[in-house]
């Protein structure tokens, strides 16, 4: 059996795919003039379809997002089917809260590496002062230097050295190198 024949006999869903694309294209075509729409390549049309889908999903999730530029030009109808021109109370509709970076940090906790940088340098991690576990207790006793002071003390003298010198291992056996002279230098 030839592989090309098997591909030709396989059932295809071109009718369903083209129907979905046609509906999506009709949905987007209302934002463009006929001339603009005819000049556009199908790949550009697909990009606009996905831009609109992304806008719809983000607004349904509760994010405050701006309209894509192509949807702003006509302002014909939003994705819910409301007519902007006839809706006088459009501005009075309930706005969803805007997600900020801080609120996202509360939702998704920080992912810490297994070995923080302080532990690699021989320093221990000091827990944060805020939170229900600590209840305002003093984390660093007055006699002990704080983590910041330890970092400043350890990093101060290293500033003059190269950054990679602490990574070099010390040789256990000394190697003595002999200088080889060039015959050209001997002639002089």
UniProtKB/Swiss-Prot annotation:
Task: Give the family this protein belongs to, as stated in its UniProt record.
Answer: Belongs to the SSX family.
Question: What job does the chain carry out?
Answer: Could act as a modulator of transcription.
Which residue windows does the record flag with biased composition (Basic residues)? 156-167
Query: Any idea which UniProt keywords this protein has?
Result: Transcription, Transcription regulation
Which segments show compositional bias classed as Polar residues? Answer: 145-155
KW Amino-acid biosynthesis (keyword) present: no
Example GO biological process: regulation of DNA-templated transcription
Gene Ontology annotations for the cellular component aspect, listed alphabetically:
nucleus
**UniProt domain KRAB-related: residue ranges:** 20-83
What protein name applies here?
A: Protein SSX4
Per the record, the domain of life is Eukaryota
| Basic and acidic residues bias: start-end ranges | 116-127
- State the organism of origin: Homo sapiens
Q: Where is this region: Disordered?
A: 116-167
- Keyword Transcription among UniProt keywords: yes
Q: Which Pfam families match?
A: SSXRD
